[in-house]
Every structure is written in structure tokens, then in C-alpha cells.
Amino acid sequence: MEFDFDISQSLPDFITKVDNTLNPFNRQLDVTSRKRLQQNLIVIIDRMGMASAKARLLRRLTAQSLKGAITTAAKLGISDHRLYILKETEVNRGLGKVVGILKVGKKKLFVVDYTGAQHECLPLCVLDFYVHESQQRTGNGKLLFEYMLKAENVTPSHLAIDRPSFKFLSFLQKHYGLRDTLPKQVNNFVVFEDLFNLIRKKKSGGITQHQPTSLKPPIPPTGRRCMHFLNLTIWQTR
């Protein structure tokens, strides 16, 4: 998605993590500059959130209405969620464009296993995952998803997915071998059998809670995209 301003000023990294401070700029700025960049960031988040909502067919949205959008800057600002935003810089006359978003956060859930037993848990949940239609089937979704996994220090099978689309479930099966075979959860989250193994280990005291890690993606060199931060080095020429 393209914007009429330089997105790299508001999104300093190839994949930028945004929390409730709405302040990923990582440098000293005067008040006026910070407000301008933050306002541009709000525009990015809200427009990508609206695009995601439309793609998920939640409801029809207009440019004046954010009702139904899972991801908005206002909602992010009053939560403990994290939003990962993937960009591409050397397009749109150098202004760049936003490729996709991925929002995660912990939620207290009651989930049912194969036996019908109910468990209370606090898993990391995928709350919104959207890659712009023009950038799908290019590896961008997996790039964004894997970066989140590493940053949050989480295993895919331990995630809870909020109302995943058929396309998202196919993505999880293709790349991680995960199948939606458990009974349908009343809360519309999809979970996997390995999550119950984790719950049992935690109850028995046999596992330590993982903490998110701090990742800093490199700045891609001119004309090429660097994907060095996933223990891989891939150079993609324009």
C-alpha cells in the first residue's frame, strides 16, 4: 500500500515493531517532528487495518469509518499488543510502500482438547495478519511471520489464531505442518494439539515461560533487500 509521504521516516526498520507508545522512531526528535511522524504512523496503521478488515470480509468499511477493523492505532494505543509492519523502500518514487502487518498479544482463553476437557491458558495470539494483495505469494507473509516468531520467542504450534481465514490455515499447514483438527472452539480461536502439551508442562512445573527477544533488522543496501535477520542471508535485487 502506497502513501503520499516517506514511510521510512515513521517505519525506521525493514520490519518495524510498534507497541502502545506508537513511537518506534529510535532517535531524538523535536516535538513537532515527532508529532508529524506519529501522525503518519497512525495513518499507516489505520489504513492497513481497514484493508485487513475488508480482506477478511468482516464488513464493508468506508474511508470515514474504522468500525469492524481489528487493527487501529487507537486500539493499539490502549493495549499491550505488538504490531509488526513490513515495508518496501525503493518504490513509489522513493516514498516506499507498506507490504503487510501482523498483530499479536496475549489473551486469557478457555480452550477444549480432544477429550472435551476445558483448559485455561494465556497463549500468544495472532490477532491480525494481512499482506497486501499485490504482495501475496511472494514470500512476504512467511518473512513477516518468521520475524514475529523469532522476536516473540514462540513456536508456531503454541500460538492461538483469532478467526483465521482458509488462506491463513493453508499457510500454516504448508510452512509449519499445522492442521486444524481439534474441536471448534466457542471463542473462534484456532489452537493446535501442541498447545495442550505446553499447558500440561506448565501445570507440572516442567517449563519456563519464554520472553520476547529484541531483534533489530539491518538496513537494506540501495537497490537490494537484505533478509539477514532470520539466520539467513538473502539478497533480492530489484
Curated annotation (Swiss-Prot):
Enzyme class label: transferase
Catalytic activity, as annotated: L-lysyl-[alpha-tubulin] + acetyl-CoA = N(6)-acetyl-L-lysyl-[alpha-tubulin] + CoA + H(+)
Enzyme Commission number: 2.3.1.108
Gene3D superfamilies xref list: 3.40.630.30
Keywords per UniProt: Acyltransferase, Transferase
Presence of keyword Magnesium: no
Residue numbers binding acetyl-CoA: 129-142, 165-174
GO cellular component: microtubule
Disulfide pairings: none
GO biological process: microtubule cytoskeleton organization; regulation of microtubule cytoskeleton organization
N-acetyltransferase domain mapped to chain residues: 1-196
One GO molecular-function entry: tubulin N-acetyltransferase activity
Alphabetical list of HAMAP family matching this protein: mec17 (MF_03130)
Family stated for the protein in its record: Belongs to the acetyltransferase ATAT1 family.
Function: Specifically acetylates 'Lys-40' in alpha-tubulin on the lumenal side of microtubules. Promotes microtubule destabilization and accelerates microtubule dynamics; this activity may be independent of acetylation activity. Acetylates alpha-tubulin with a slow enzymatic rate, due to a catalytic site that is not optimized for acetyl transfer. Enters the microtubule through each end and diffuses quickly throughout the lumen of microtubules.
Name this polypeptide is given: Alpha-tubulin N-acetyltransferase
Organism: Trichoplax adhaerens
